[in-house]
């Protein structure tokens, strides 16, 4: 190999929802990372979690996603609530849905304290997302989860 040219291995994770490439650009991004998810199925919802530190930036390279977003009570009064109990979050929250696709190119910025999740609308959807804090550094303390259906949301595709 030519001197100073290097090859870096990429972490791979797979489950029944998606295949993920984690920390794609490890070098030069010591505090942040870029991940890529290949979503196999349109039948699964991924999510309902928020981060206390991370901001995520989502971009659909191929396919389409229905993205659910909920502003948590903690986001409204962040300074008073350092230790969050997800059971105390008001379930009457308003779920907003955004749609990302390769036909409507945009980046969705998801700040801390916003619950988020998604369902692929097309099999084989590819989501590339940048996070401003490395997952391994903050994941133990940064990730708060509630189950799908917690907010009474409908992940279906409505007939119009």
Segment roles from a protein language model:
Residues 119-120:
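Asparagine-centered strand-capping/turn motif at beta-strand->loop junctions
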Residues 1-107, 123-160:
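Non-catalytic, conserved peripheral segments adjacent to functional cores
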């Amino acid at each position: 190999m030519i001197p100073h040219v290097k090859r870096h291995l990429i972490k791979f994770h797979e489950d029944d929802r998606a295949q993920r490439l984690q920390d794609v650009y490890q070098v030069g991004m010591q505090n942040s990372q870029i991940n890529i998810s290949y979503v196999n199925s349109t039948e699964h919802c991924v999510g309902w979690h928020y981060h206390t530190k991370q901001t995520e930036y989502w971009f659909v390279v191929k396919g389409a996603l229905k993205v659910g977003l909920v502003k948590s009570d903690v986001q409204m009064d962040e300074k008073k609530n350092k230790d969050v109990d997800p059971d105390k979050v008001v379930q009457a929250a308003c779920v907003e849905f955004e749609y990302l696709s390769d036909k409507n190119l945009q980046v969705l910025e998801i700040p801390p304290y916003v619950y988020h999740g998604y369902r692929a609308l097309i099999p084989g959807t590819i989501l590339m997302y940048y996070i401003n804090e490395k997952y391994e550094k903050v994941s133990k303390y940064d990730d708060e989860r509630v189950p799908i259906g917690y907010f009474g949301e409908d992940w279906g595709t409505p007939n119009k």
